[in-house]
Structure formats: structure tokens, C-alpha cells
Amino acid sequence: MAKGTVGLFDSGVGGLTVVREVSVILPGKRVIYFGDTAHVPYGDKSVDELLSYAERIIGFLCSQGADYIIFACNTSSAVSLRLMRDRFQVPMIGLIEPGAAEAVRLSATGRIGLIATEATVKAGAYARAVSALNRNCQVFSQAAPRLVPLVESGESDTPKAEQAVREYLEPLREQGIDTLILGCTHYPFLRDVIERVLGPEVVLVDPAAATVRAARLDMLRRGFSADNPGAQGEQDTVSLRYFVSGSADAFRAVAGQFLGREPEPVTEICLLR
């Protein structure tokens, strides 16, 4: 079976929450990550812009050897995935369906909250995915446009971030949700703040782990090796290459806060300018 190389992309550092799950669920897998930091945030971009970004990034990832693509961005998953599957032969998976399935599984009351970018909320993909799984579940959606810029500027755990989180979550609290989908891969950077605001009675769903588990099963069905045990006694490692369309230094600084170390190597590439 082919070992394969996984390509992931997001508007910025948020997709690193998915890379982290790849390192656990797909040990030893070669990974190429593209952060489109020149165009972050994606939530206020038009459909045409999002399709253009996705097409160029996926083409680049494939040129670098990726033969399986994980959309590490909810906005692109909601807007671009279906069309990109038509344009490329490489298999792809997005965050929406696995995240919706996890929320339906965990919700006891069927009252599911969603915070996401404006584009993801407008696309309605999570509501459709949840309804397809269980028509008795309701999705209460809230766009949270200020959160991605806060994460990208390294302000995840600040009073400014907590004020914004409280503002966005209050309408969902009033709806009596028992489960909240973190509908943007940047939002796990804010997990501690969100948990403080909502308390333990609301379960948080990060679609990243469910998506990578689904990717692993899909790879096995397609004849890929889902991991790389290597030679006997060889420790599993994840081979990572990072590319960004904006500042490599800015990406390293914010990513280092999340990873506990600065990612290397990070290469700036003028792919989308």
C-alpha cells in the first residue's frame, strides 16, 4: 500500500489544531501544511475568492507530493470542498460532516450550538449535516468574526478575547444548548476562555479529531497505509513542512504558543498574491 503524504490547509494557524490530531491518529505520516496568512481571515471573503484560494493551494500541495488532502478550515470545507473534489483527482475530506456527527453523538438534548465564521454560518453546511443525521436536533448558529484575528495576533487568552467570546456565546446560552461545535479551527486556541464562559454543562466539539479519524478510515479503504510504523525499534515521527503566504516570522510566533515550540521549516511562498 502507498504510504502517502497528507496536505492540509487553512487561512492561518488554526489548521495546526488538525495537524496535532494527525500526529496522534496518523503517526509517522508525512505532512505538508499551507497557512494562507496573506488572506486571513476567510470568513469575510466571497465565494469566488474562497474557491480561487482553495484551487491554487490544493494545486500547490499536490505539486509538493500530497496525495490526500484534509481541509483544515471549516470555511473552505463549507464553501469549496464539493467543487474541489470535481476539479482534482486527489481524495479529500473536510471538517463539516465528521464534526456534525460528533455533535449529534454527544448532545443529550439535541440543542446544538455553533460558532463559526460568517461565511461558514451563511453556507448552512453544519445545519444541513446535523439535520441529515438526526432531524430532531436543532442547530443554533452564531457568527464570531472577531475571534480569528484575535488568535492570529496572539491574543487568545486576554480580557479582550474573553469579552468577545462572552458576547458571541450569550445568544447560544439563552437557547439552552448542551453542545457547542467549534466551527473554526482557530477556536480551540480559545478553548480555555470558552469553557470559562459556558461552564462544564456544555460539551465542546472540536471537529479536528473526528475528521482525522474519518480520514484514516478513508485512507484504509483507498489502499493507503494509515500510518508508518517504520523499521523495528524506529520511533514514529511526523515529517512536517510548513508553507505560508504571509510572514513566516509571524506564523512561527503564534504557532509556537500553541505547539510549545516554533515550527520549522516555514517557507514563505507568493502563491496567491
Swiss-Prot record:
GO terms, biological process: cell wall organization; peptidoglycan biosynthetic process; regulation of cell shape
Tagged with keyword Isomerase: yes
Protein EC: 5.1.1.3
Disulfide bonds: none
Keyword terms of this UniProt record: Cell shape, Cell wall biogenesis/degradation, Isomerase, Peptidoglycan synthesis
Alphabetized InterPro entries for the sequence: Asp/Glu/hydantoin_racemase, Asp/Glu_race, Asp/Glu_racemase_AS_2, Glu_race
Family the UniProt entry places it in: Belongs to the aspartate/glutamate racemases family.
NCBIfam families according to UniProt: glut_race
Protein name: Glutamate racemase
Organism annotation: Desulforudis audaxviator (strain MP104C)
Organism lineage string: Bacteria, Bacillati, Bacillota, Clostridia, Thermoanaerobacterales
